A protein has these predicted regions:
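Divalent metal-coordination and catalytic microenvironments
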Residues: 8, 25, 30, 57, ...
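Metal-coordinating catalytic core of metallo-dependent amide/deamination hydrolases
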Residues: 137-284, 290, 511, 515
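Active-site gating loops and adjacent loop-to-helix segments of metal-dependent hydrolytic enzymes
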Residues: 75-106, 162-188, 251-276, 298-301, ...
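His/Asp/Glu-enriched, well-ordered alpha-helical/loop segment
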Residues: 271-278, 320-407, 423
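Histidine-rich, glycine-flanked metal-binding segment
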Residues: 2-3, 10-61
Length: 523
């Protein structure tokens, strides 16, 4: 099947920044066959089997890439606030929790994010399915949801094999013996078991519909033995796959590297062989100058997640410094329990605004064009699809979105990328073509019965809220006081940051003391 998109304002997103207004895009099968000025379009006729899409008053963009998301959190939107990562984690992923969800529940949770992704212009998502070892029902449910929705998805098999008490510095010494024994009673699967489970998922789903990829994802170096990290590296090399890992999201994690290894977590990952061009580091906030140099030298990528970094108070990723060093940077929304959205346009807006604080030197700011690249070509490389997606160019996959130029945020049309970042909402996304297939037309998703899905999701999500969330919070409360002590102890310590000893990333201020305290007097 061929499609001709005619008369659009085409922003190709290619390296040259090509724009055609009006422009045409010819799609043949799952590939872009031609793009250029409408006046130079190949001669076509509707009778020749080509679907004609009249795209006058439409802005054509490359499909957006959400390079880091956790769809398994979608029933927890609005459940948390004012919690730093370490305390949020024990609520959303409680260490004392024997409950498992059905495959259908996993399917529905993923479908929530899939629908929101399509509606916000995402055509490719990297879903970090954060279920240890990724239980078969979890990955099967997620993969089926993406297959049915028509999205391109790179799904991770999450891995960690360290007991909960050994994933945070100082924690084991704080937790009383009876509680520690209970926490140690059900250890995670071994490194060998998790590698074997990855092989099962890879054989079952990788390459499905030409759109589904399966990749390894050690949850974080502090949660993984070196054997498991090396196992993930070996899987990545054997199958030529990306490997994604959460690293240095918080100050506590920066302290963890020093306590566990006597070096930064990035330096430790380099020692076990993980830093390669296939490696993506999620968050990357509490970096030293040496860390940045290592990431650049090894050809690594990072994902920037401004919404969750802000909500969790984690800090500000040094994106400009990373880009200037030659590190590839992609954009993500992160989980829907930390950013509370899978809407990539919200992340584009946050990323385009956040880096204008912290310095008056405008050369260090990020602009809308910078963040648009993160959400297109940057995401393509991070997901292992460089040259395949991320731009409207002949030979690339036919992932194209059409936005309504008559949306209020585009009137007048001064600069479509700046207005994408600062002016519009996802309601402006009208049509989505993924892998050469029209998945959404005039805001109606063609691949599924959205009303029926919404009704089923509402019932399942309400049951989760009523029955599951209270149990999760109860499990968290049993360890919260000890995790808070770890957090308070770690955040009071000095750690090196971007080559300088300081406590907080740019934009973080030290707590101010009153005059009496500064002078050593009682207030």
């Amino acid at each position: 099947m061929a499609i001709l998109i005619s008369g659009a304002h085409v922003v190709t997103g290619d390296a040259a920044g090509s724009v055609y207004d009006p422009g045409d895009i010819l799609i043949e099968g799952d590939r872009i066959a031609w793009v250029g000025p409408a006046s130079e379009a190949p001669a076509t006729k509707p009778a020749s089997g080509i679907e004609m899409i009249d795209a006058r008053r439409r802005i054509a963009l490359p499909g957006l890439v959400n390079a880091h998301m956790h769809s398994n959190e979608s029933f927890e939107q609005g459940a948390y606030d004012n919690l730093p990562l370490e305390l949020w984690l024990i609520h959303s992923y409680p260490p004392i929790d024997g409950q498992r969800l059905s495959e259908r529940e996993h399917y529905l949770r993923t479908m929530v994010c899939a629908i929101e992704s399509i509606r916000s212009g995402v055509t490719t998502v990297q879903d970090d399915l954060l279920v240890v070892g990724t239980e078969p029902e979890a990955l099967d449910g997620a993969a089926k949801a993406y297959r049915d929705a028509g999205l391109r998805a790179v799904i991770t098999v999450a891995m960690w094999d360290r007991p909960f008490l050994d994933c945070l510095p100082f924690l084991r010494e704080l937790v009383p013996g009876d509680l520690a024994a209970e926490l140690d009673r059900a250890p995670p699967p071994t490194a060998a078991e998790q590698v074997a489970l990855f092989e099962r998922h890879y054989r079952a789903w990788h390459g499905t519909a030409g759109r589904i990829g399966i990749i390894p994802a050690p949850s974080g170096p502090q949660r993984c033995s070196d054997d498991l990290l090396r196992g993930a590296v070996e899987l990545s090399a054997r199958y030529d796959l990306p490997v994604h890992t959460h690293v240095l999201e918080t100050k506590t994690q920066a302290v963890t590297g020093q306590v566990f290894y006597g070096k930064t977590l990035v330096e430790h990952l380099d020692e076990v062989g993980m830093l390669t061009p296939r490696f993506t580091m999620n968050h990357a906030i509490w970096l030293t100058g040496r860390d940045i140099d290592l990431l650049a030298e090894r050809g690594c990528s990072i994902t920037h997640n401004p919404l969750s970094n802000l909500k969790l108070g984690s800090g500000v990723c040094p994106v400009r410094r990373l880009i200037d060093a030659g590190v590839n940077v992609a954009l993500g929304t992160d989980g829907t329990a930390t950013s509370d959205t899978a809407d990539i346009i919200e992340a584009i807006r946050a990323g385009s605004l956040l880096h204008k604080i912290g310095t008056h030197d405008t050369s260090h700011w990020l602009g809308a064009e910078d963040v648009f690249r993160l959400a297109t070509r940057g995401g393509a490389r991070s997901t292992g699809l460089a040259g395949e997606i991320g731009a409207i160019e002949a030979g690339r996959k036919a992932d194209v979105i059409l936005l309504d130029a008559d949306a209020w945020g585009f009137i007048p049309l001064n600069d479509p990328i700046r207005q994408l970042a600062f002016s519009i909402t996802s309601e402006a996304v009208q049509t989505s073509i993924i892998d050469g297939r029209v998945v959404m037309r005039d805001r109606v998703i063609a691949t599924l019965d959205e009303a029926a899905i919404k009704a089923e999701v509402a019932e399942a999500a309400e049951r989760f809220r009523r029955e599951r969330l209270p149990a999760m919070h109860a499990g968290a409360r049993r360890v919260e006081r000890y995790v808070r002590q770890v957090y308070e102890r770690a955040t009071a310590m000095d750690v090196p940051l971007a080559g300088e000893p300081q406590r907080r990333p740019p934009g973080f201020a030290r707590p101010q003391r009153g005059r009496a305290q500064q002078e050593g007097r009682k207030p």
